[in-house]
Every structure is written in C-alpha cells, then in structure tokens.
Amino acid sequence: MKASVFYGKDDIRFEEVDKPDISDKEILIQMKACGLCGTDIHKVTEELVPSGSVLGHEYAGEIVAVGKEVSDFSLGDRVTGGIHVPCFTCKQCSRGHYTLCPEFKKTNIHPGGFVEYIKLPEEHVNHLLYKIPDGMSYSEASLAEPVACCIHGQKAVDIYAGDRVLVMGAGPIGLIHSQLLKNKLVKEVVITDVSDHRLNNAHEFGADLTINTGDTNLEMYLQEQGHPGFDVVIIAAGISALLPQAMNVLKRGGTVVCFSPFTVKPVMEIDASMFFHDEKSIVGTYSVSPYEFEEAILAIQNGVINTEALITHEMPLADLGKAIELTQNKTENVLKIVLKNE
C-alpha cells in the first residue's frame, strides 16, 4: 500500500509500505479522508518524529477487514475515531481525567492517518470508533477529532450563556471554538490573529468582532472602546507571548484556557498577583476523551460546525508535502486541508 512518509522537514515521500495484518479483535479500514492538523505540521517542521514515520490522526474511512471476534462493526461500515485510548481503570480515569491516563499516549492507530489502510487495535475498536451518519461525507467526518478536542477544551472551564469570550487565533481550531461558543449562547466572541486572510473569514464562523493584533494593541484598543474584558480567553495559537496578554484582558475571576502547545519561547513572565487579588486562573487542555467524539459527530451532523466553509482544500494523499507548504505560506485563503484517498 502507499503512504506519505516523513523523512525530514523538506522530505515527505509517497511510497510503498507494508499493509497491516489484523488479529481477531482488530479492524482494517481504507482511509478515505484525513485532515491536516497544526500538530502534524509542527512535528514535520521541527522534526519531532523519527524518520520513516507516518503522521495523521484526523481520519475517516471504510471498514475493509474485520477480525472474527469483532461484533459491533461490519464490512462496509463508514467510520471515524481517535488515536489515544485510556485504560478506564486507573485513578485518573476513575476521576474522569481520561487524557491524563498513563496509558493514554501509549496507544495509537497503525501506522498513521496519511496512508491507504489503517489498522485499528482492539482498544480502539472497543472504545474509540464511531459510525459515520448517513449523509455525512468522509471529509466532514474527518473533522470529528478536532471538533471533539475543542469540546474537551471548553469543558475545562465553566462557560455560561451571556459570557464574553476571546479566542486568540483564527485558524481552523479557533474557528471551531467560535462556532461551539455561539452554540452555547455566549454574549460575545472576539477573535484575534495577525492574518487579515483568516480574520476576514471569522465572522462567517460566529465572531462578533475581529482584531488584527499585528497592527493593533489589544489592551489599549479594548480600553479605548470601554470593553469590560473577558470571562474566558482561549489561546488557540502556540505562541507563549499570548499568555500574559490573555491574563491582562481577563475579567476578575476569569480563566485562560491554553489549548495549543507553546512552540515558541515557552518560558514567560506573568504578574502572579493576578492569581490572588483577582482570582484569575489558567488551565491547560490536551487531546480528547472517547465521550466527546459522539458530541462532535452530532455537532457536525446538526450544522453547528460550518464544514463547507472550514474545509477550503481537498488534495490527494500523495500531496501531503504540498499541503503543508500551502498551509505555511499563508498567501492563499487556506483553512482546513483534507487529504483524500480515492
């Protein structure tokens, strides 16, 4: 079978790899669509994975082989799912903190998502595989993973109808957050970014106000407008300098949600008095638990997520390198790129 294989930041090869065999409790799917995530791009550009790795985790496909002990799925089923599965028995799992389970990151699909065929191990079949509803395309279904991650992230903080929320970053993740927030009837969603291309799209995804922080001082602008500040700030861009800025525009008692890994200068200074006097807080959020996938699929199915506008490009699986380059150069109106295997 063919796969897009990582050998270096400028070396992605579409080549033959071994097609996985499955056991009696496993499933093989033919990958039909796999979304390109910012995490994939970060791993490629920073060369954080071994040479010969297959990336990709936002997958959807058709079951083409079923182990004889699998009873809940059949040949031809259209499915989507995640990559990490908790044990469900440890202390973290018993408290509902599934993404903190020691076994969580040890589990994965094989060999990755940017490949013609994916093997789903027993734990994925049992806990992290979902049938795609009729009428939902494979490309739409591939959005279930990032939507589920955003749902998980928003559960890390109390968000109420009538709240004012700032989303820092107008990429696909920030725009998904915006739509989920609007579905919660928040009073205001403000989105910041340094790209006019992306900010021009943001109103289509629920933003009430957009601010280009490349040429506008956010704190000064809000003060001049008499803005009361935000109940919640979601950082959806991996830039550590955003964290002090987020803290400064929070209301007293507000919370910053660190959704993205800080890939640029992760060490920073923050005025610690805000934690005591103003009861401001910071929470982190990582990945997704199995239960948020069902919510994500329903959100897509019910039109909470504008999939047609979010997916701006569909490209052949062989063009992964081109897709990464297209996302990075930011000269086009690029939001979500989905790699197709047809």
Where would I find each of the regions flagged by the language model?
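C-terminal hydrophobic helical "lid"/dimerization subdomain
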Residues: 3, 244-248, 290-342
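Short Gly/Pro-enriched turn/cap motifs at secondary-structure boundaries
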Residues: 7, 18-19, 51-57, 74, ...
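Glycine-rich beta-strand-centered segment in the early N-terminal region that forms part
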Residues: 20-34, 47-91, 133
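Short glycine-centered segments of the SAM/dcSAM-binding site in methyltransferase folds
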Residues: 78, 164, 254-255, 281
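NAD(P)H dinucleotide-binding glycine-rich loop of Rossmann-like/cofactor-binding domains
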Residues: 89-168
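Mid-domain Rossmann-like dinucleotide-binding core that forms the NAD(H)/NADP(H) cofactor-binding site
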Residues: 136-215, 220
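Glycine-rich cofactor phosphate-binding loops and adjacent beta1-alpha1 units
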Residues: 157, 205-280
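C-terminal substrate-binding/catalytic core of Rossmann-like NAD(P)-dependent dehydrogenases/reductases
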Residues: 223, 227, 264-313, 321-322
